[in-house]
Structure formats: structure tokens, C-alpha cells
């Protein structure tokens, strides 16, 4: 029996320990937001957070996440309460086909959690492992930059108003 936390809930599963995390989340827990793209950890469509770090889950055996915290796109925000990146994706009309977008958002969220004010080059480096076959890279980058800029503006306002 493998236990872990999935989107804030303690869960367990009794599957082959070599089963990729992606398939456990999709097939056993019915969370379909993370996608299968390549099966080799190259495209990023399957990206989830494991203890806060972006990880390609199509090549991550479920045994590797025992007792860890997993966050999927479903755990990042809700339709009623979007994560700032999800809102920015809408504002900047990022998706075209949408297939890769959950992985893109998860990679971007891990980046901004680790570095709230990334440079253009840092965004490129962090997002390099996520492929968008539709070529939406400029819109993806603008959305990430807008969230970073808005967070910095909010932090500056909070400090000015004595809330920080």
C-alpha cells in the first residue's frame, strides 16, 4: 500500500509500485487534468508538483512519491477561485488546442513559487521542458510575466500600506 497526499487529501493505493504516477492519478483517482504526451518525460504534458517541485509524472513510479505531497492542476485552483496563473492564461488567451496547458501551468507555478520575479531567461529555462505543439510560447511567457509583475505590485502596495 502506497500512501501520499493528493491535492491536500491523504490517499493510498495498492497498485504495482512501478506504475507511473500519471496513470495512478488519472485512472485510480479520476483526475484527468494532467495529460499523457510522450511517455518519456520529454514533453511536460504530465507535469505535477511533488513536494512543490515540478515533476514529469509519466516516468515517475508511484513508489517514488510515497509519503510525499502531490498537487495536480485540479488542486492548483478551482473554476470559482482560479490560481493567478490560470487567470493570466485566460487574460492572455494562451491556449490554442489546450492539451499541454495543465503541464505548462504547473511548471510555471513551480517556477513562481521558487522565484517570484524570474528574468526572461529564467522563464525560458524553467519552461524549456514543456512543449507546446501549437507554438503558444510568447503568450505563455507573457502570462507568467504578468503574474510576476502583479505579485510584485501587490507586495509593494502591501509594504507601502504597512500590511507586509
Predicted regions and their residues:
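Signature of N-terminal electron-transfer/Fe-S-associated modules in redox systems
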Residues: 1-164
Amino acid at each position: 500500500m502506497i500512501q501520499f497526499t493528493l491535492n491536500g487529501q491523504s490517499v493510498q493505493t495498492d497498485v504495482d509500485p512501478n506504475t507511473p504516477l500519471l496513470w495512478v492519478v488519472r485512472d485510480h483517482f479520476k483526475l484527468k487534468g494532467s495529460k499523457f504526451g510522450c511517455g518519456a518525460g520529454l514533453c511536460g504534458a504530465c507535469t505535477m508538483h511533488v513536494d512543490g517541485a515540478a515533476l514529469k509524472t509519466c516516468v515517475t513510479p508511484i513508489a517514488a512519491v510515497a509519503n510525499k505531497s502531490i498537487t495536480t492542476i485540479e488542486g492548483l485552483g478551482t473554476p470559482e477561485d482560479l490560481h493567478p496563473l490560470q487567470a493570466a492564461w485566460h487574460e492572455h488567451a494562451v491556449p490554442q488546442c489546450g492539451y499541454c496547458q495543465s503541464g505548462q501551468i504547473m511548471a510555471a507555478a513551480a517556477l513562481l513559487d521558487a522565484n517570484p520575479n524570474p528574468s526572461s531567461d529564467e522563464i525560458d529555462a524553467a519552461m524549456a521542458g514543456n512543449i507546446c505543439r501549437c507554438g503558444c510560447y510568447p503568450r505563455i511567457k507573457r502570462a507568467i510575466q504578468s503574474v510576476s509583475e502583479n505579485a510584485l505590485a501587490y507586495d509593494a502596495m502591501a509594504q507601502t500600506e504597512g500590511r507586509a
